[in-house]
UniProtKB/Swiss-Prot annotation:
Name of protein: Dehydration-responsive element-binding protein 2B
Cell location: Nucleus
Organism: Oryza sativa subsp. japonica (Rice)
One BP term from GO: positive regulation of DNA-templated transcription
GO cellular-component term (any): nucleus
Region listing for Disordered, in residue ranges: 1-87, 216-270
Principal location: nucleus
Stated family: Belongs to the AP2/ERF transcription factor family. ERF subfamily.
Function recorded in the entry: Transcriptional activator that binds specifically to the DNA sequence 5'-[AG]CCGAC-3' of the cis-acting dehydration-responsive element (DRE). Binding to the C-repeat/DRE element mediates high salinity- and dehydration-inducible transcription. Involved in drought and heat-shock stress tolerance.
Keywords from the UniProt entry: Activator, DNA-binding, Nucleus, Stress response, Transcription, Transcription regulation
Pfam families: AP2
DNA-binding region residue numbers: 88-145
Superkingdom as given in the UniProt entry: Eukaryota
Transmembrane spans: none
Length: 373
C-alpha cells in the first residue's frame, strides 16, 4: 500500500470517538479560590443581596425559602469519624482522621459550599453560623445563638471567615453584631477565669497560712514542752518558765535556720534537747531492784581480766563453786587431763582415735556413770 493510498483511506474513514472512562458520571467542577465562583465571592454575593433587600424595602424582593432542617446525617450513618454520630451541629461532620469540616448549601437548593476544616466541632459550627447569617439573613438556622457560642470557637470561626472573605463580605451590622456577641462571650470567659484564679489564689494563701502556722516558734515550743523541766517559781512570784521557753525556742529556730555548712564546721549541730541527767543522780535505796555502782567498779578493778580466784578445800570434799576458790572444780571420777586434752585438741571430739571414751563417758568404770541414776 503506497503513501497516496494511505492518505486517501484516512480521508475517507470517519473519526473514531473515544468513550468516556466512567460513563454516566458527571465531573463536578472545582471552585477556584480567587475566581468569581470561589466560596468567598459566593458568600459575599449573597450577603450583598440580603443587605440590599433589607435596606431597600420598596425595591423588588425575591422570594426566599428558609433552609431545610436536614436529615440528621442519615446519609452519614456508619461513615466519617468516631464522633460523627454523636455530633448534632448543622453542616458539621467529622473526617475519619479526626478533623471537623463545615459545609452549607446555597439558598434555593443550590450546590454546597465548602467552608473549611477545623480542629473542633464547635469551631466548625460557628463557621457554619456565620455563613448562614450572611447567606440567609434573619431566616438562617444556626447552631448557636449570637450570645451563646463559645468564645474560642467564635474566634476560630471569625478567623476562618475572614480568610474566606478578604474584602469583608459581611455587612457592617452583621459584623458589629458578631463582634458584640464574641466580646460578650470573651467577657464571660474572662470573668470565669478571674474567679477561678481568685479561688486558686485563695487556696494557695490558705495553704501558705497553714504552713506558716506549723512553722511558728510558739507551736514548736508547745510541742517540745514535755522535754523541759517543770517551771520554777522565783522569789518575786514570777514564773521562770517564760525565760527558759524563750531561750529554748530561739535555740530551735536557730537550729532550723542554720545551714548545713555551719553544722559541718562546728562538728555537730546545736543541741535541741536538754542534756541527760548524770548517773550520780539516779535514785538510791531501792532495795533489791538496784545495784551498787561503786561495788561493781571495785570488782572490775580487782579482776580486770575476769579470771577470778578459786578458794576452797583441795581434797575435793567441798565441791561448791564459789568466787575466790584456789582451783577449779571437777566432777568426782572424771580425769582432768582428759578434759584438758579435749579442749586443747584441734580435731573434733568425734574424730579422736579412742572410741572407748564415748562409751565410758570419761569415767573409769561404767558403774560410776549409772550409780546416781
Amino acid at each position: 500500500m503506497t503513501v497516496d493510498q494511505r492518505t486517501t483511506a484516512k480521508a475517507i474513514m470517519p473519526p473514531v470517538e473515544m468513550p468516556p472512562v466512567q460513563p454516566g458520571r458527571k465531573k463536578r467542577p472545582r471552585r477556584s479560590r480567587d475566581g468569581p465562583t470561589s466560596v468567598a465571592e459566593t458568600i459575599k454575593r449573597w450577603a450583598e443581596l440580603n443587605n440590599q433587600q433589607e435596606l431597600d424595602p420598596q425595591g423588588p424582593k425575591k422570594a426566599r425559602k428558609a433552609p431545610a432542617k436536614g436529615s440528621k446525617k442519615g446519609c452519614m450513618k456508619g461513615k466519617g469519624g468516631p464522633e460523627n454520630t454523636r455530633c448534632d451541629f448543622r453542616g458539621v461532620r467529622q473526617r475519619t482522621w479526626g478533623k471537623w469540616v463545615a459545609e452549607i448549601r446555597e439558598p434555593n437548593q443550590q450546590s454546597r459550599l465548602w467552608l473549611g476544616t477545623f480542629p473542633t466541632a464547635e469551631a466548625a459550627a460557628c463557621a457554619y453560623d456565620e455563613a448562614a447569617r450572611a447567606m440567609y439573613g434573619p431566616m438562617a438556622r444556626t447552631n448557636f445563638g449570637q450570645h451563646h457560642a463559645p468564645a474560642a470557637s467564635v474566634q476560630v470561626a471569625l478567623a476562618a471567615v475572614k480568610c474566606a472573605l478578604p474584602g469583608g463580605g459581611l455587612t457592617a451590622s452583621k459584623s458589629r453584631t458578631s463582634t458584640q456577641g464574641a466580646s460578650a462571650d470573651v467577657q464571660d470567659v474572662l470573668t470565669g477565669g478571674l474567679s477561678a484564679c481568685e479561688s486558686t489564689t485563695t487556696t494557695i494563701n490558705n495553704q501558705s497560712d497553714v504552713v506558716s502556722t506549723l512553722h511558728k516558734p510558739e507551736e514548736v515550743s508547745e510541742i517540745s514542752s514535755p522535754l523541759r523541766a517543770p517551771p520554777a517559781v522565783l522569789e518575786d512570784g514570777s514564773n521562770e518558765d517564760k525565760a527558759e521557753s524563750v531561750t529554748y525556742d530561739e535555740n530551735i529556730v536557730s537550729q532550723q535556720r542554720a545551714p548545713p555548712e555551719a553544722e559541718a564546721s562546728n562538728g555537730r549541730g546545736e543541741e535541741v534537747f536538754e542534756p541527760l541527767e548524770p548517773i550520780a543522780s539516779l535514785p538510791e535505796d531501792q532495795g533489791d531492784y538496784c545495784f551498787d555502782i561503786d561495788e561493781m567498779l571495785r570488782m572490775m578493778e580487782a579482776d580486770p581480766t575476769n579470771e577470778g580466784l578459786w578458794k576452797g578445800d583441795k581434797d575435793g570434799s567441798d565441791a561448791i563453786l564459789e568466787l575466790g576458790q584456789d582451783e577449779p572444780f571437777y566432777y568426782e571420777g572424771v580425769d582432768p587431763g582428759m578434759l584438758d586434752n579435749l579442749l586443747r585438741s584441734d580435731e573434733p571430739a568425734w574424730l579422736l582415735a579412742d572410741p572407748a571414751m564415748f562409751i565410758s563417758g570419761g569415767f573409769e568404770d561404767d558403774s560410776q556413770f549409772f550409780e546416781g541414776l
